[in-house]
């Protein structure tokens, strides 16, 4: 009988303290998430120092809760996976040092995981990854198109040249007057409005899979500023709808085109913005028309969580890609450099 492989995973790259236990690469035995949204809401965004303090306060309790929920002990764990980056360096160090302490104390292998690889592997939980595939990464800090020919093989074929899509959502939300986090609020409001504004769609160079959202963001901000200056009433839902349609149209078109050019029949979506209902519907419609298999994680697995780190960590475990206790956190790590040889 084959022994079950249990991975304890730790994620502290931004404003969620999360610990998970993953069995055999796909089964979630526990996935404890301690959110900091309420603490950051009054600032209108994540404050790194506040985030780090909350991670320090919550990491030990979160580890214990994850083990209890999974009904396992540290002796049962085969390896410890942890997000090494990219992310907020102070936040990352809390998780990395906690993972190193556990690895040392219990003599367990230590697995460093790229945060974006984790988001990609969240899809593997719901449906096994099949290759080749295109991954559309949409989050607060990243917007990328990635070609994967096999497990842990990452070729970035497109990325944002300025703002990530999540950043654009948050800035537009603040301009409209919505509370943090802005992305989900814009998505909800967009479902109630009409596309009455001609906001730009930024395509960039012909055949380019890069993205740019700073011009769109500025167009929305300038439109609202001009209307307020002239005392012209603003219908917030229409602004949200028009903005979201501009974003979704570009993301969908480039993702589908990438699938066609690379002769790929599988598209996966990863990152916090993958929970956006407008984007999910647009991709579903176009994938159906183009006979492309679409996988998007359930919303709870789109946002930062340790389960996705554990799933990616299991693939790294199988390849024997471990770190020693000199492991450190890194605010920036190139996904392609992290790719398997």
UniProtKB/Swiss-Prot annotation:
Residues the entry annotates as binding Fe cation: 115, 119, 304
Protein's UniProt keywords contain DNA damage: no
Keyword Nucleotide-binding recorded: no
Compartments where found: Cytoplasm
Co-factor remark: Binds 1 Fe(2+) ion per subunit.
Requisite cofactors: Fe(2+)
Main location: cytoplasm
A GO cellular component annotation in the UniProt record: cytoplasm
Catalytic activity: L-threonylcarbamoyladenylate + adenosine(37) in tRNA = N(6)-L-threonylcarbamoyladenosine(37) in tRNA + AMP + H(+)
Reported function: Required for the formation of a threonylcarbamoyl group on adenosine at position 37 (t(6)A37) in tRNAs that read codons beginning with adenine. Is involved in the transfer of the threonylcarbamoyl moiety of threonylcarbamoyl-AMP (TC-AMP) to the N6 group of A37, together with TsaE and TsaB. TsaD likely plays a direct catalytic role in this reaction.
Family designation: Belongs to the KAE1 / TsaD family.
Protein name (Swiss-Prot/TrEMBL): tRNA N6-adenosine threonylcarbamoyltransferase
Species of origin: Staphylococcus aureus (strain Mu3 / ATCC 700698)
């Amino acid at each position: 009988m084959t022994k079950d492989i249990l991975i304890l995973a730790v994620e502290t790259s931004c404003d969620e303290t999360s610990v998970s236990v993953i069995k055999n690469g796909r089964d979630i035995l526990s996935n404890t998430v301690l959110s900091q949204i309420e603490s950051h809401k009054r600032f209108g965004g994540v404050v790194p120092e506040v985030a780090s303090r909350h991670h320090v306060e919550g990491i030990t309790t979160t580890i214990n809760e994850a083990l209890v929920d999974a009904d396992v002990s540290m002796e049962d764990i085969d390896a410890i996976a942890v997000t090494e980056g990219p992310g907020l360096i102070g936040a990352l160090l809390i998780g990395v040092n906690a993972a190193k302490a556990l690895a040392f104390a219990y003599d367990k292998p230590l697995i460093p995981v790229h945060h974006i690889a984790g988001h990609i592997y969240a899809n593997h939980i719901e449906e096994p990854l099949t290759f080749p595939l295109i991954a559309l990464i949409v989050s607060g800090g990243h917007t990328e198109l990635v070609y994967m020919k096999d497990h842990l093989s990452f070729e970035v074929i497109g990325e944002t040249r300025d703002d990530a899509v999540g950043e654009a959502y948050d800035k537009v939300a603040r301009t409209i007057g919505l509370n943090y986090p802005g992305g989900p609020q814009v998505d909800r409001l967009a479902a109630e409005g009409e596309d009455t504004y001609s906001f730009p769609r930024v395509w960039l160079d012909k055949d380019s899979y890069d993205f740019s959202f700073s011009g769109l963001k500025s167009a929305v901000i300038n439109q609202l500023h001009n209307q307020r200056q002239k005392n012209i009433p603003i219908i917030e839902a229409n602004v949200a709808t028009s903005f979201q349609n501009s974003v979704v149209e570009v993301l969908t078109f480039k993702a589908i085109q990438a699938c066609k050019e690379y002769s790929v029949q599988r598209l996966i979506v990863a990152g916090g913005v993958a929970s956006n209902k407008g984007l999910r519907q647009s991709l579903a419609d176009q994938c159906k028309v183009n006979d492309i298999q679409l996988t998007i994680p359930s919303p709870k697995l789109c946002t930062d969580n340790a389960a996705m780190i554990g799933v990616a960590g299991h693939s790294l475990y199988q390849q024997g890609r471990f770190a020693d206790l000199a492991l450190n956190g890194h605010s920036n790590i190139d996904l392609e450099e992290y790719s398997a040889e």
